[in-house]
Amino acid sequence: MTLSGRTALITGGGGPLGRAFALALADAGARVILVGRGEQALADASDRVAKEGGEARTAVCDVSDPDSVTRLAAQLADEDVSLLVNNAGVAGPVRPLVDVEPGEWDDVFAVNVRGVYLMCRAFLPPMIAAGRGDVVNVASVSGKRPLLNRTPYTASKMALLGLTRTLAGEVGPRGVVVNSLSPGPVRGPRMDRNFRLTAELTGCTVEAAERDFASRAALGRLVEEDEVARALVAMLAMPGLCGADIDLSAGMIAPA
């Protein structure tokens, strides 16, 4: 598939998965704009894309802050962004719900749900006016299979699936396609943190926590960043896909 001539905006662009998305989309021909809160992380990701022969600009933005998103939209007003990848997300606490502080709950929803709403609100109008565009929201398999001791995160991803389906119905008739991608546990720094916190909570070893997560998948393993990125590109090559969610979890499906 070619994305030549299209501009893709990726939130959470300084993280490992954002970087993988950038590499895959640039390889498909897209111009990439990486958005995130960490300037150095964004610069490192942009350099990686450039080394692979792609093009990636960066812009600092806090997607949970309406003013920051408004400034970003004004900054990129002439960029003709036709692909929005809402990848920014926070993992939140690893504790039973009764031990979660209200501020921790709010922090998770501020990025994982409110951030997606704010980005869509800012960048959908030009797509609607042009009669074309794609939005891919990065959800999680935990939005379909509850993850114990991760209630804020699980609830936020369930909310994101609902947002995706509803928004697809609103803007699909205007030529804009909205879908979501639900990875399982992706190998990398975020899951390493989750394994450590799970081990501390349950009293097991970090290695045992990782084995437990992997055992929940039919393939018995975690998902790799490049697998998720390739799935994103594949989704964009399916013109009939709208209001859908693609599960990329190595078979970590919801129990019957």
Spans of model-derived segments:
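Conserved glycine-rich cofactor-binding loop
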Residues: T7, G14-G15
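Substrate-binding pocket helix/loop in short-chain dehydrogenase/reductase
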Residues: V81, R95-L97, E104-F109, F213
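Short C-terminal tail/terminal secondary-structure segment
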Residues: V94, R145, A237-A256
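C-terminal substrate-recognition "lid" of short-chain dehydrogenase/reductases
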Residues: Y117, R221-L248
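Active-site helix of classical SDR
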Residues: C120, S156, T164
